[in-house]
Amino acid sequence: AAIHEDNPELAAVQKRGIPTLTRAQLLGEIMRNYGQAVAVAGTHGKTTTTSMITDMLLAAGLNPTISVGGILKDIGGNIRVGGSELFVTEACEYTNSFLSFYPTAEVILNIEEDHLDFFKDIQEIRHSFGAFVKRLPDGGLLVINSGIDRLEEIVGEKNCRVVTFGKGEDSDYTAKNIAYDEFARPSYDLLIRGEDAGRVTLGVTGEHNVYNSLA
């Protein structure tokens, strides 16, 4: 996304007729080879949430392939090549990069004003996320923050399973009785569709990570 048409190296290979792919297009092509492809999107929290998903999948012995935007200690970098049908990646909206992906499941953490060097305004950002949802196949899974403004416009009429998380009691997954230790690490009671599913204790700080972990 950071390389534009005036980049001299890009211009040179295009002049020679050499095929090129953006990073997002390459990830999209890789994604097509996996039966279960999870794309984690949102203005904030993508790297943290992708890392949390990675840790859970590894703990479950599911041997996923991972592409994450930061260095993750458990995989010794930002890429892990697994041996299963599971692929998990961050999905960035900048330059509509995530519209090159082929996910079977999507996570949308939040939608706020960002990348205004590319998007005109928040409405254009929302439109991009709506187009992202449309890339899900029929029967796919959308996990989305119930607090997103005018949520129904993002979800649209897509024929997929929708699971919500957030502060609202009408969310499928929500946190109650949030408390913090002396290092600001939260714990909370996890409610799944109103039913108590146990106490969750996080090793990372801040309320925002309560909602990242719910996703």
Regions found by a protein language model. Name each.
Residues A1-S146, R150-C160, L214:
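Phosphate-binding loop of NTP-binding sites
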Residues F119-R126, G140-L141, G156-A215:
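Adenine nucleotide phosphate-binding catalytic loops in nucleotide-utilizing enzymes
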